[in-house]
From Swiss-Prot:
Record-stated family: Belongs to the UPF0735 family.
Pfam families xrefs: ACT_4 (PF13291)
Domain ACT: 76-152
Superkingdom of source: Bacteria
Identification of the protein by name: UPF0735 ACT domain-containing protein FN1487
Entry-linked InterPro entries: ACT-like_dom_sf, ACT_dom, UPF0735_ACT_dom-cont
Organism of this sequence: Fusobacterium nucleatum subsp. nucleatum (strain ATCC 25586 / DSM 15643 / BCRC 10681 / CIP 101130 / JCM 8532 / KCTC 2640 / LMG 13131 / VPI 4355)
Length: 153
């Protein structure tokens, strides 16, 4: 669905794993990355990726990286943790080693051996670009059943 510039009430935003996006959208992301990272011209980047100009211009304004911002942002980490002593401490240690500010921590009682936990963190602009690596490190903690992240501002 295309949005008109004045259409702000009907916009809905989602965090979607890039792997499930259609190839045309993934290619627009590649073009944007080339332009941003290599200072390549739009024309050259479009040609290098091999998509049509119309496809690029149709979608380019609707695709932004998750970490794009320019200021500190607050994110919620939603964790499903296997019920074992010290697992939350292990997760917090990973966050501390990454020098990330923790704003709040909420942990619920374990049900069927799994505890839900939410950690509110504040990431600087430079850390936002590393969010995938941070989530990966947290996900490697023994006993993490699931991890999700959402932005809150």
């Amino acid at each position: 669905m295309a949005f008109k510039k004045k259409d702000t009430e009907n916009k809905e935003f989602y965090i979607v794993d890039k792997r499930i996006l259609p190839k045309s959208i993934q290619n627009v992301i590649k073009v944007n990355d080339l332009i941003l990272k290599t200072k390549m011209s739009k024309y050259s980047a479009i040609k290098k990726v091999g998509i049509s100009r119309s496809t690029y211009y149709k979608y380019k304004d609707f695709i932004k990286p998750f970490y794009e911002g320019g200021e500190d942002r607050i994110y919620s980490l939603h964790l499903s943790l296997k019920d074992r002593v010290g697992i939350l401490s292990d997760v917090l240690d990973v966050i501390a080693r990454e020098k990330i500010s923790i704003l709040t921590v909420v942990q619920n009682m374990a049900v069927d051996g799994v505890a839900k936990s939410t950690i509110l963190i504040k990431l600087s602009e430079s850390m936002q670009k590393k969010v995938d690596k941070i989530i990966s490190k947290i996900g490697k903690v023994e006993g993490i059943a699931d991890i999700r992240i959402t932005g809150s501002n």
